């Protein structure tokens, strides 16, 4: 950076006054100040853009690292689940089949032998079609009452009067 002290600035001002003259010096100083301000704004914009790009690059790398870690965790979980499912199928097949060891050596999954059954396929029963009326009858009465559109609205005072015991009611007077 330039080392401009007060004495050097004064020397530059005197030289500019001599060269430009007192009439044009204020106009040139104003123009120089405007150009200097524009240059500073441009430099600040470039600095901000560079810092934003650096932050975005850091965020991108963090995002890729996070996604990679998530994929690794997901793969680990799936591998563990597959291993446990294989163990369960082997235990199930050894318990179901009379031989035991022959069924446990067979591969699992869709390529398995047609006689071999998975614990998952036996445990899940086929979905039965429910009757519409039975399904509607299952809805609780309190829920129907709470969600029903009210056709008769009663004020709070009328509700209190309706539930007040007869012994506490005032006698109704007409005229």
UniProtKB/Swiss-Prot annotation:
A GO BP entry: protein transport by the Tat complex
Superkingdom in the source lineage: Bacteria
Primary site of residence: membrane
InterPro entries found in the cross-reference section: TatA/B/E, TatB
Subcellular location: Cell inner membrane
Quaternary data: The Tat system comprises two distinct complexes: a TatABC complex, containing multiple copies of TatA, TatB and TatC subunits, and a separate TatA complex, containing only TatA subunits. Substrates initially bind to the TatABC complex, which probably triggers association of the separate TatA complex to form the active translocon.
Protein name per its UniProtKB record: Sec-independent protein translocase protein TatB
Lineage start: Bacteria, Pseudomonadati, Pseudomonadota, Betaproteobacteria, Burkholderiales
Gene name as annotated: tatB
């Amino acid at each position: 950076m330039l080392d401009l002290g007060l004495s050097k600035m004064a020397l530059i001002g005197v030289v500019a006054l001599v060269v430009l003259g007192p009439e044009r010096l204020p106009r040139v100083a104003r123009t120089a100040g405007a150009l200097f301000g524009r240059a500073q704004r441009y430099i600040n914009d470039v600095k901000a853009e560079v810092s934003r790009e650096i932050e975005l690059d850091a965020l991108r790398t963090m995002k890729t690292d996070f996604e990679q870690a998530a994929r690794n965790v997901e793969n680990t979980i799936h591998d563990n689940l597959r291993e446990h499912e294989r163990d369960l199928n082997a235990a199930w097949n050894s318990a179901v089949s009379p031989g035991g060891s022959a069924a446990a050596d067979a591969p699992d999954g869709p390529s398995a032998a047609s006689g071999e059954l998975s614990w998952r396929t036996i445990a899940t029963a086929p979905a039965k079609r429910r009757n519409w009326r039975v399904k509607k009858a299952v809805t609780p009465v309190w829920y129907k009452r709470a969600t029903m559109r009210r056709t008769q609205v009663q004020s709070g005072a009328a509700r209190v009067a309706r539930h007040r015991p007869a012994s506490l009611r005032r006698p109704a007077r007409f005229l």
